[in-house]
Amino acid sequence: ATPLTSVLTSYGCPAICSFCVAGKINYQYRAPSNVISELETIKTLGIKEIFFRDNVFCANKKQGHLLMNMMIENDFGFSWVADTRASILTDETAKIMKKSGCHALHIGVETANPIILKKYNKGVTIAEIRDAFRICKNWGIKTVGYFIIGLPGEMVEDIKKTIDLSIELDCDYASFNVALPIIGTELREEAVKNNWVNSKNSSKYDGSFEPKIESENISLEKILEMRDFAVRKFYLRPSYIVKQLISLRNFYQVKSLFNEF
């Protein structure tokens, strides 16, 4: 496997999504020169791959562009991946990302319902999401789309539209996750107030797919059923299977693909 490490260029998140605690942390970023010093040390260790673990890489575009241009000037030769937001991605930013070694981006989509996006303060439009995935494809940057199943206010038809959007965006990978009322979020407060919380381990973020919220629209069982349906519909398309078989290069890619099931 390629030697890999993670790097933080910023801490916290400038976004205020109601289902996430990262926005509660004061957003701070490191000076690009400080990050470059760390990357210089990393290169001496033989590391080839970087995972920038920022909640939103390049949230401050001025600092992000400066860092990536410094990476290009230093000719580190790293390939890298990061989490970012659809609203950040422009042709200019994607061009610098690609030139500095970016080969994949993780992008939160959450839902195809614009009303739900607004309700939970996502701060991104469906049009921006479509543009972001199109831009990534144009620049040869692979994408992982993140989707939430079962946000309060959603109907089954909304979830089906979200699944359809994941296919329309033509993500290289899609991660379908059930809504989780994490302590400290507005989503948690809403769930408790309306008695939507599944009391058993409802506050525990254990990384499982167990549904934690039950609203008047969708039962816990239905949420899990729709999550499984989403995975099957996205990953078992003949065209997708053929594309992945052609592109798979090693065991780790195969393992990550099957982890969704």
Where are these regions (language model features)?
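Catalytic cores of alpha/beta
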Residues: E92-K95, P152-E168
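Radical SAM [4Fe-4S] cluster-binding motif and immediate context
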Residues: A1-Y146, D164
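Pocket-edge positions in alpha/beta enzyme catalytic cores
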Residues: Y27, N121, L151-E154, S215
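Radical SAM enzyme core and accessory elements
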Residues: E186-F261
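Conserved beta-strand->loop/alpha-helix structural units within folded catalytic cores of enzymes
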Residues: C136-Y146, L151, L165-N177, L236
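Residues in well-ordered alpha-helical elements
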Residues: S33, A127, V156-K160, E221
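Glycine-rich beta-alpha loop elements in corrinoid/cobalamin-binding modules
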Residues: V178-G184
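Histidine/acidic-residue-rich catalytic or RNA/ligand-binding cores of hydrolases
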Residues: G64, I159, R188-E189
